[in-house]
Design a protein with these regions (language model features):
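Basic, polyanion-binding surface patches
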Residues: 1-183
Length: 183
């Protein structure tokens, strides 16, 4: 195998496509696309964010949702990452999204995105948002035997090497199980 150097680049696979939902000071829903995020503890999510309308909203409400972008919503999810609510105040509706107020946090659940984390801001320093996960909810349509089923959810990931969105593949093994055969 021959390796090629690419230098220091943000190439990590897969990068989940996270759609952050907030309300502004007037209760108007806003959303943005963020790919640089991850679970950082059992009840914690960390997301790298520069200054946006969303970050201004977070300073006001301190609460947000993180929905998982899906194969069926690529165009809308990409749109909310391209357009700023500072320039297009109605971008939430223009994306075709509809909001239902979360009963756990002061933030919108996006009806078109079937899975969401409901979060409170723990800290936001040096462009790193750390949120406490208060609840995870999912539409029944993406469940199998009471669990979230990735095949039904159809989450997408961001491919930073090619600037594309890709689907998540098939099950190839059982976590915390298959490796036991080497013990």
């Amino acid at each position: 195998m021959s390796r090629i150097d690419f230098g220091a680049k943000p190439l990590l696979f897969p990068m989940p496509v996270l759609i952050i939902g907030t309300y502004d000071e007037n209760g108007v829903p806003n959303t943005m696309n963020a790919a640089w995020g991850m679970i950082s503890d059992f009840k914690e999510i960390s997301i790298s964010l520069s200054e946006h309308k969303t970050t201004a909203n977070l300073a006001v409400t301190g609460e947000f949702t993180v929905s998982i972008a899906t194969e069926d919503t690529v165009v809308a999810c990409d749109y909310v990452g391209i357009v700023s609510a500072n320039d297009e105040p109605d971008k939430f509706a223009k994306a075709g999204f509809h909001a239902t107020k979360s009963d756990k946090v002061n933030a919108p659940l996006i009806d078109e995105l079937p899975m969401a984390l409901e979060c409170r801001v723990k800290s936001f320093e040096d462009d790193i948002l750390i949120g406490e996960i208060v609840n995870v909810n999912a539409d029944e349509s993406v469940l199998t035997d009471g669990k979230i089923d990735p095949k039904k959810l159809k989450p997408i990931a961001y491919d930073p090497a090619n600037n594309t969105y890709v689907t998540i593949g098939d099950v190839v093994g059982k976590a915390f199980s298959d490796g036991l055969q080497l013990k």
